[in-house]
Amino acid sequence: MKHKSLILAVILLFPGLFAAAQVKDTVRILAIGNEWSADVCTRDTYAYFETGGQPVVIGYVVKTDADYAELAALAKSGEPAFLYGKVVRGDTSEREGVSLAQALKDERWDVVSLQTQSAQACRWETIDPGLGQLIKYVRRRTPKGVRLMYFQTWPYAHQSTMHWMAFGHNNRDMYRLLADVSRKFTDKYGLEVIPIGTTVENLRSSFSMEGDVTFADRLNCTMGSYAAAATVYEAVTGRDARELTDAYAPYTLENHVRREMAAKCAHFACLQPFEMTNMKTGTGSYGSEEAGLPNYDETKVPAYTLPDPLVMNDGTPVTSIAQWEGERRAELLELFRREVYGRSPERLEGQHYKVVLTDENAIGGMATRQEILIYFDASEEKYIRLVTWVPNGLDHPAPAFLMMNTSGNASINEDHSISYPDEQQLKNYVIHGFPAYGQYRHFYPLEMILARGYAFLSFYKSDLDPDFDDGFQNGVHPYIYKEGQTFPEPDQWAGLSAYAWGCSRVMDWLEEAQTSVDPHRVSTIGHSRGGKTALWAAAQDTRFAMAISNDSGCGGAAISRRRYGQTVRQIQTTFPQWFCRNFLKYMDNEDALPVDQHELVALIAPRPVYVGSAAGDMWADPKGEFLSLVHAKPVYELYGIHGLPTDVWPDARQPLFGDRMGYHLRLGKHAILGYDWVQYLDFADKFL
């Protein structure tokens, strides 16, 4: 196998086998198998981990066509019969003539995967006892606690000739054998699984794009490679691979929809590693031409008519503030609750609070950090763990930003005294491990926020709902089910409403149990699903003084009727846990919606509202996000507030600060960056 390079220059000189990587919190993965393992390791996997903010070293030990018995025999003999490769800081280097013992000693491996070719992996007799012997060998030579994972291979493509006759030239039959055998021996030997075979079959069965997945018996370099990398990433880290499809866009797979398809199939494979998931929707495949690829052409936006926020359901015009606040506002809230997000409960009896940590010298003395448990009732079974940073030295209660985080409180800052979830929480959320401390600190520029005199408050989304399609069994939802209830009713709350409900519980604490933050000067803020949450929380709870949405897209600030980028169908196919079941009626049927997202923005009136978009985030429909502000403007004008200074969508980096309305279009992709925060802080200086 030829020497390869992924990203940087190849390392040609190294002491011993290779220079060991010295990266804090690095995950070290060693794949033992044949060229298939090497294919996965040396293509997109390293870049996928790095894009997710997870430093990684990837090694692979290759012996062509070896079954487990031969691998075990070679290991026991110490014969230097393997090719050993390693990816460090993006560089791939290889060396022939290495023993398995040498490779195992080269790094303190966190994960070791085991793999053999599919034709052998389909039959139990080719696995036992060789696999058991190999497992014992590896466990004796690796640190205690190393994770052993079975690398589930994929069925061959139809044009393959390798061992193909034995399976009747039917890759579905071959997959069933692979899945059944892998289920049995992972159970027998207590191995975790990297279910690449299931990912590949998900792609084949759901999208009928064989040439984009495999060629003969090998993965191709487009969707197949991307999907395999997504599978390894989610299986090893426990983080949702779908969250990186905007951020990681290699030139081999520039089409966003295909990246999303690949990551989605990987995600469902990790949820059901031994069972194919068919993700076809409606009459065609999700993302196929039959179902409709996302539209990114403004000339193809269909003609549509928006519902008027200032017209009652019975057609009566709204002409006064009293009429808006006394009648129409309640109508719109009812429609959003019933048809889109679902109804949330009121606060529960017995809600109370407990400060469990205080650090008066956080962020180098800039702030006092606290952790507060917001218990939902007297039982103390369920709670939000709120983390707060309040600037030191103020002579008044601080204004604040409340932002739900998606990766755990510890991901916000490098401070190792920030609490991690306990073992039971990790189990409930189906997570194998959280990001490193401060891994996503660029999303939360605490020093900038604190220096401007603002407090920053945050909680982890999965304190309310774990954000995967679990049938609402692991979050707050079953905690309030009625006797005999096992699932929300069609108009009851789903994930986004649970997150917004959590924001209101934080506001309860701000009003009732503390004095360092001004509860009358708190803005919700959020990115992506957090942006949807920020708008919905502020729309329902008028105690929030301002709302800021960053790249919130479909179901957030973007007009649904435009069908630009992500649509109602696509968001509910990918994230069915976010919306109430009644919202399913509007898949491919947006014109029947009794509301649209400009009315969500209008519900925040007369309070300040800001929408941030990204020019490269066409999936979120940045123009549609801007138009929600434009079409919410009449409600603000009812209060004598002028809103945006123009109805013309601005160029990138030309922020619009109007009268209690703001908007900007940032260069770049789906993220919340320093440029965004500068605009939000400037806007808050004027209006919060």
Model-derived regions: residue spans:
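Conserved catalytic region of serine esterases and O-acyltransferases that act on ester linkages
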Residues: 25, 216-281, 287
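Conserved SGNH/GDSL esterase-like catalytic core that processes O-acyl groups on lipids
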Residues: 27-30, 36-128
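Alpha-helical cap/lid subdomain in secreted, periplasmic
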Residues: 97-222, 234, 243
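N-terminal pre-domain segments of enzymes
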Residues: 278-343
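Cap/lid segment of the alpha/beta-hydrolase catalytic domain
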Residues: 404-513, 519, 560-562
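Primarily recognizes the serine-hydrolase "nucleophile elbow" in alpha/beta-hydrolase
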Residues: 504-566, 589-590
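Mobile cap/lid helix-loop segments that gate and shape the active-site cleft of serine hydrolases
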Residues: 549-600, 625-646
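C-terminal catalytic histidine-bearing segment of alpha/beta-hydrolase fold enzymes
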Residues: 584, 630-688
